[in-house]
Curated annotation (Swiss-Prot):
Record comment regarding domains: The binding of ZFY to DNA is mediated by the interaction of the GGCC core base pairs with zinc fingers 12 and 13.
Subcellular localization, as worded in the UniProt entry: Nucleus
Protein name as it appears in the record: Zinc finger Y-chromosomal protein 1
GO molecular function, one term: DNA binding
Alphabetical list of SUPFAM superfamilies matching this protein: beta-beta-alpha zinc fingers
Principal subcellular localisation of the protein: nucleus
Keywords: Activator, DNA-binding, Metal-binding, Nucleus, Repeat, Transcription, Transcription regulation, Zinc, Zinc-finger
Matches recorded under InterPro entries: C2H2-ZF_domain (IPR050752), Transcrp_activ_Zfx/Zfy-dom (IPR006794), Znf_C2H2_sf (IPR036236), Znf_C2H2_type (IPR013087)
Protein origin, superkingdom: Eukaryota
Organism phylogeny: Eukaryota, Metazoa, Chordata, Craniata, Vertebrata
Composition-biased stretches (Basic residues): 373-382
Length: 782
């Protein structure tokens, strides 16, 4: 006997029919009636179901009325031929009944030992449904019931150990019920079952410890309770129990995991059966091909063992089980379905899938491999980083893994998205042990919190040193400060800072400020205590101090603008509120909001004026005003001249005001002539206009002049080979030896080699001595 086949022995002490119920009370010696799952014998292999012709002439099509499955299942040529019928095969009879059992005499049949109590089967190699003999006539059949022997056992599929826990597998899809007669035509349905349902074929994996592993190999079934008690050999592996569930169409068994519906275009095993006489369209049914048809391509279903959703569905439904030989498992076909399961360890699931697929599609001859072999890949992952996942298997074999959130149920394609989403949940944040006191950061590791707090300390240190030394500007980050200093460097390369009182030039403003304080300190006696900047007048220093204090005493009367300088306020009013400035009369100082009112008021002054100017249309109200107008406008002579600058004025009052400016301001003397002015800008304008020739291009090093720029560029090349003189006290450098000497003496030396001939006061440069003599001793230089 093959080691995969199990020898069955009858149970003599207790009959199978002891607890069947009231339907089995009236029985005689020749009749045994059992009400079990309804099964319809459709036809032999010559029956055509909706243009469906099986390839194997010995195959039989069976319709399961209760479970709505149309199956062409096994090789019947070895079972149904009269010459091959033996005592080793149990061939029960099919009996018609709608809801109750009927007594049918079996004396007419030529199988004398069919109801013998001692019949056993040494090799029961049959599929899910037991087939009947050809000698039984079922032409007037509406619904059938199976009549089986008391020693017929429940069906169990023996498999290798897959998992230690019982887990159910959803592997079937919803189909519709249809009953076919012997000619292959559909019959009217007498049940009021739902047409659209969702039936699932449930497969569960039991532990070996649940079976009584003793010497006896008897297997019995209790038809009422639906529970089983099995006794197997000690070497027998785990058991896969197969049952079909009747699911409610309004309830989703998988919850939010997946809504899997078979496509009518992709599923090649579905067909529609139509009544030829009534032309009534019967709901679609599933047709399963025989295992001998190796030419047909069949879609495979990958079975994923779930831990949560699939495990909870098998407990609520009865189980219909059968036992078959392991060598004939290849003849049983599973419907195509989408399966989904939540798992905590995807690697163990892959191992279970490989084992289950190999057992359900075992074919030693290499004829038909329904599920491709998969190699298990075990990767050790830390338990703290495990995430719950869901696996979806499509009919074409493609799998899709998603990661659902354990708090809200949302699904994500990758673990990274799930991890980012989970961090926003308050439930996740509440589990953190360590929380940062400076921000919202939290963590479970103390070292991570320590590293995070160090980043706060570095931020505080950088905030203290983010002030620019050149312009005193506060910056937010140290990197921004470096970029800002680079801007100062670039500006210094392209721009040179020049002293307006001497020939000193430098690339940085700070060095120029230092030069002004050291060299020209006497010219700027009023120095700011905050930044060290010097001013000539205390009013200028007072205005500058407002920059540091933030004081803005000048307010705009039309808006909220404030300024520290009155000139800035005037500019603001002219640019922003030019339309709002009232019109003011130049004679009586009256103000007007409208231009028309101002013009009407001016007419009144014109009418009151009786003194007409003989040179123009000007009128005055008195003679003195008319005389002043004629002298200032129509007279070229300036009889009133200034003694200090020889500037002429029309009136003595104007000259008096001009002389006051000479007394209040210091005079700036021209180096080339006797011209002096209290305004340094006027002095610069004088030098450019009077003492500068019309030469556009001049060398800055040797002061040589050129008429064209190309000549100046050619001349500048001659200075490139000269020696560069670098000052050891500052960053000043030059290629002119005399200029370098002058720089050292004037900036970094306390000696005053040039002394005044009248007061013996010393100066660093001759120009300073000459300016002193002209200003204080009133002596012209030759």
């Amino acid at each position: 006997m093959d080691e995969d086949e199990i020898e069955l022995t009858p149970e003599e002490e207790k009959s199978f029919f002891d607890g069947i119920g009231a339907d089995a009370v009236h029985m005689d010696s020749d009749q045994i009636v059992v009400e079990v799952q309804e099964t319809v014998f459709l036809a032999n292999s010559d029956v055509t179901v909706h243009n469906f012709v099986p390839d194997n002439p010995g195959s039989v099509i069976i319709q399961d009325v209760i479970e709505n499955v149309l199956i062409e299942d096994v090789h019947c040529s070895h079972i149904l031929e009269e010459t091959d019928i033996s005592d080793n095969v149990i061939i029960p009879e099919q009996v018609l009944n709608l809801g109750t059992a009927e007594e049918v005499s079996l004396a007419q049949f030529l199988i004398p030992d069919i109801l013998t109590s001692g019949i056993t089967s040494t090799s029961l190699t049959m599929p899910e449904h037991v087939l009947m003999s050809e000698a039984i006539h079922v032409s007037d059949v509406g619904h059938f019931e199976q009549v089986i022997h008391d020693s017929l056992v429940e069906t169990e599929v023996i498999t290798d150990p897959i998992t230690a826990d019982t887990s159910d597998i959803l592997v079937a899809d919803c189909v519709s019920e249809a009953v076919l007669d012997s000619s292959g035509m559909p019959l009217e349905q007498q049940d009021n079952d739902k047409i659209n349902c969702e039936d699932y074929l449930m497969m569960s994996l039991d532990e070996p410890s649940k079976a009584d592993l003793e010497g006896s190999s008897e297997v019995t079934m209790n038809a009422e309770s639906g529970t089983d008690s099995s006794k197997l050999d000690e070497a027998s592996p785990e058991v896969i129990k197969v049952c079909i569930l009747k699911a409610d169409s309004e309830v989703d068994e998988l919850g939010e995991t997946i809504h899997a519906v078979e496509s009518e275009t992709k599923n090649g095993n579905e067909a529609e059966v139509t009544d030829q006489s009534t032309s009534i369209r019967v709901p679609r049914v599933n047709i399963y091909m025989s295992a001998s048809d190796s030419q047909k391509e069949e879609e495979d279903t990958e079975v994923i063992v779930g831990d949560e959703d699939a495990g909870g569905t098998a407990a609520d439904t009865p189980e219909h089980e059968q036992q078959m030989d392991v060598s004939e498992i290849k003849a049983a076909f599973l419907p195509i379905a989408w399966t989904a399961a939540y798992d905590n360890n995807s690697d163990e699931i892959e191992d279970q899938n490989v084992t289950a697929s190999a057992l359900l599609n075992q074919d030693e001859s290499g004829g038909l491999d329904r599920v491709p072999k998969q190699k298990s890949k075990k990767k050790k992952r830390p338990e703290s980083k495990q995430y719950q996942s869901a696996i979806f298997v499509a009919p074409d074999g493609q799998t899709l893994r998603v990661y659902p959130c354990m708090f809200c149920g949302k699904k994500f394609k990758t673990k990274r998205f799930l991890k980012r989403h989970t961090k926003n949940h308050p439930e996740y944040l509440a589990n953190k042990k360590y929380h940062c006191t400076e921000c919202d950061y939290s963590t479970n590791k103390k070292i991570s919190l320590h590293n995070h707090m160090e980043s706060h300390k570095l931020t505080i240190k950088t905030e203290k040193t983010t002030e620019c030394d050149d312009c005193r500007k506060n910056l937010s980050h140290a990197g921004t400060l470096c970029t800002h200093k680079t801007m100062h460097t670039e500006k210094g390369v392209n721009k040179t800072c020049k002293c307006k009182f001497c020939d000193y030039e430098t690339a940085e403003q700070t060095l120029l400020n230092h030069h002004l304080l050291v060299v020209h300190r006497k010219k700027f006696p009023h120095i700011c205590g905050e930044c060290g900047k010097g001013f000539r007048h205390p009013s200028a220093l007072k205005k500058h101090i407002r920059v540091h204090t933030g004081e803005k005493p000048y307010e705009c009367q039309y808006c909220e603008y404030k300024s520290a300088d009155s000139s800035n306020l005037k500019t603001h009013i002219k640019s922003k509120h030019s339309k709002e400035i009232p019109l003011k009369c130049g004679i009586c100082l009256l103000t007007f909001s409208d231009n028309k009112e101002a013009q009407q008021h001016a007419v009144l002054h014109q009418e009151s004026r009786t003194h007409q100017c003989s040179h123009c249309n000007h009128k005055s109200s008195n003679s003195s005003d008319l005389k002043r107008h004629i002298i200032s406008v129509h007279t070229k002579a300036y009889p009133h001249k200034c003694d200090m600058c020889s500037k002429g004025f029309h009136r003595p009052s104007e000259l008096k005001k001009h002389v006051a400016t000479h007394k209040s301001k210091k005079m700036h003397q021209c180096r080339h002539c006797d011209f002096n002015s209290p305004d340094p800008f006027l002095l610069s304008h004088h030098i450019l206009s009077a003492h500068t020739k019309n030469v556009p291009f001049k060398c800055k090093r040797c002061k040589k002049e050129f008429q064209q720029q190309c000549e100046l560029q050619t001349h500048m090349k001659t200075h490139s080979s000269r020696k560069v003189y670098q000052c050891e006290y500052c960053e000043y450098s030059t290629k002119d030896a005399s200029g370098f000497k002058r720089h050292v003496i004037s900036i970094h030396t306390k000696d005053y080699p040039h002394s005044c001939d009248f007061c013996k006061k010393g100066f660093r440069r001759p120009s300073e001595k000459n300016q002193h003599i002209m200003r204080h001793h009133k002596v012209g230089l030759p």
